[in-house]
Amino acid sequence: MTTVVVPRSAWRSLIAGSGLAALLQIDGTLVTVALPDVGRSLTVGPQPLAWVITVYFLTYVVFLLPGGRLVDRLGSRRTALAGLAVFSAGALAGALASSFPLLIASRALQGIGAGLASPAALAGAVSGFPPERRGSALGIWGASSGAANIVGPLLGGLLTSAFGWRAAWWALLPLAAASAAAVIRLLPATERATAPGGAGTFLRRRNVVLAAAAAGLTFLVMIGSFFVIEQYLQRSAGYSPLLAATAPAVIAVFIGAAGPTAGRLIDARGERPVALMSFLIAGAGLALYGLTGAPLHGFGALPLAILLGLGLGPLFAGTSRAALNAVPQHAHGRVSSLLSASRLLGAALGAGLSGLALRGGADATHVRPALTFGAALCIVVGLPVAALLRPPPAAQEQI
C-alpha cells in the first residue's frame, strides 16, 4: 500500500479549523448549562428557555449557505475572521442583556457569526488533506468537538456557580480572540474562485444528501439529550450547575475518544459500517434508560453517557468525510455549509422538541419518553440512512 504524505501546512490548517469548530461547539454546551440560572434570574420557565438555544441555531443555519459561498470565493481565513467578529459582538451583547428578549436578540447575532465561521472551520480543516486521508483528519476534528463538549459544560457550570450566568457569555470573548489568533497564524490567506453551481447542485449527489441527514440526526439526538439531562439534573435531582455539567462532560469524553480511532477505521473500511454501528450503539443506550427504570443520575447513569458518546462520536468524522469526498475541493465551502446547516437544524429541533417534552416538568416521567423518542430516531431513521451510504466514484474524489 502506498503511503500518502500529508504536508505540514495541512496539519497547521487542521489545528486552526478544529479550534474554530471547538469554539462554536463550546458555545452551545456552555450556554446550555447556564440556562436554569438564566431562567431564575430573568423569570423564565423551561419551555421558553429553549429559545436561547433554538434562536441561535436557526440564525446559524440561515447564514451557513452565504458563509459557504464566501469560503469558496474568499477563502477560509477571511470568512472565519468575519464570522468571529460578529459572533464576539453577539457574545458581548448577551453578557450585557438586561431582559430575556435582549438575550434572545444577542443569540441571534451570535448565530449569524457562527453561520459565517462554521463552513470555514470544516473546509479549512481538511484543505490540505487528500481524500484517502480525510477520515483521519476529520477524526481529529471530531475529537476537538468532543473536547469542546467537555470544556463547555464544566466551564459553564464553574462560571455559573461562581459568578452567575452572565459569566458564561463573558468567557466567550477571550475564547473567540484566541481562535482568531490561530486562524491568522495558521490558515493560509488564499483566494478561491467559485466554480459553477450553487449548493443545490450538490444535493443531487446521494452521499451529500445522506450525510447531511445523518449529521442532522446526530445533533438532534446530542443537543436534545444534553438539554433534557441538564434540566432533569438541576430541576429534579437537585444538582448544582457545576455538578450537573459532569453528565454532558462524560458524554463528551467518549465522543472525543471515539473520534481519532473512528477516523482511521473510516479511511480503511468506509463510512457505512461505522455509521451503522454508531446509530445502533447510541440507540441502545437511549432505549435502555428510556424504557427501563435505570437511574438517570449518579453512577447508575454512567452507561448511558458511555454508550451515547461512543455512538455519536464516530458520526462527526463519518458524515463529513462522506459528503466532502463526494464533491471536488472547490465546492467544500458550500458542502460544509450544507453539513453544518443540517447539524444546526437538528440541534434546533432537538432543543425545541426537548422543551416540549418537558413542558409538564423535568422529572423522570417526562425525561424517559424523551430518551425513548431519541432511541427510536436512531434505529428507525439513522440505521436506514447509514445503510444507503456508498463509496464515492473516483472522479468525485478529485481535488
What are these regions (language model features)?
Residues 134, 173-196, 381-389:
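C-terminal membrane-cytosol helix-exit motif in multi-pass small-molecule transporters
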Residues 62-100:
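Conserved MFS/SLC helix-loop-helix module at the cytosolic interface between two early adjacent transmembrane helices
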Residues 90-93, 101-110, 299-307:
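Paired small-residue
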Residues 108-145:
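Cytoplasmic helix-loop-helix junction between adjacent transmembrane helices
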Residues 10-26, 31-33, 42, 46-47, ...:
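12-transmembrane solute porter fold
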Residues 141-184, 195:
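Helix-loop-helix hairpin linking two adjacent transmembrane segments in secondary transporters
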